[in-house]
């Protein structure tokens, strides 16, 4: 396996200044996998494998979107119940999402099991997951070149010690500027010229 991606596969309902969508295919593993496969196809590289969980309501056409992009779905688990759902909106510069509702559904008890034939990928991408789950994925694999992880403000707020721990096992951490400030506990305030 060239690239192994572990994370969420979801249905998103999103509002933005440009419009809105209901129950669109989303999730961190979905976007990571499609982006990775796009780049790999351009460079004629080997495959991307995805490990995640969906519910019985996961549409055949959405599975086809992933498989027709060349993503290997041997690690996709179908569990009883509904697929993870997220509802939110983007405003202004669209740098951060505002969450309106999160329905974990089958994702709530997701414990990824990396298939044996995928345990030595060239690149491991732990997409947005609880840091303890990211740690378990890292412990199941021995990436040859690069270990990346993605995180978000939720995990900084509720699982900061676990996040700091798993970050030590990664070569690259992906967060936005607001999350970087949260994580570092630094709030920059510009001094007023009158303060000098």
Language-model features and meaning:
Residues 5, 49-52, 149:
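Structural beta-sheet core signal
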Residues 6-7, 101, 127, 150:
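Short beta-strand segments
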Residues 11-23, 38-125, 139-144:
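Conserved N-terminal subdomain of the carbohydrate kinase-like
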Residues 24-28:
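Short glycine/threonine-rich catalytic loop with a Thr-x-Gly-x-Asp
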Residues 30-38:
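Histidine-anchored nucleotide/phosphate-binding helix
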Residues 122-188:
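Conserved beta-alpha-beta core of the PfkB/ribokinase-like small-molecule kinase fold
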Residues 188-196:
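Single conserved hydrophobic/aromatic residue that forms the stacking wall/gate
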């Amino acid at each position: 396996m060239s690239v192994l991606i572990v994370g969420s596969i979801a249905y998103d309902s999103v509002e933005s200044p440009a419009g809105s969508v209901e129950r669109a295919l989303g999730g961190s593993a979905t976007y990571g996998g499609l982006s990775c496969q796009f780049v790999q196809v351009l460079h004629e590289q080997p495959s991307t494998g995805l490990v995640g969980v969906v519910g019985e309501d996961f549409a055949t056409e959405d599975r086809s979107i992933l498989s027709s992009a060349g993503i290997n779905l041997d690690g996709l688990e179908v569990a009883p119940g509904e697929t993870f759902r997220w509802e939110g909106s983007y405003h202004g510069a669209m740098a951060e999402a505002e969450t309106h509702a999160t329905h974990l559904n089958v994702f709530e008890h997701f414990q990824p099991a990396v298939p044996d034939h995928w345990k030595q990928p060239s690149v491991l991408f732990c997409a947005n997951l609880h840091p303890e789950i990211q740690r378990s994925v890292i412990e199941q694999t021995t990436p040859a070149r690069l270990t990346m992880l993605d995180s978000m403000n939720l995990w900084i707020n509720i699982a900061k010690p676990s996040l700091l721990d798993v970050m030590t096992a990664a070569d690259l951490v992906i967060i936005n500027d607001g999350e970087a400030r949260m994580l570092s506990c630094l709030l920059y305030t510009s001094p007023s010229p009158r303060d000098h």
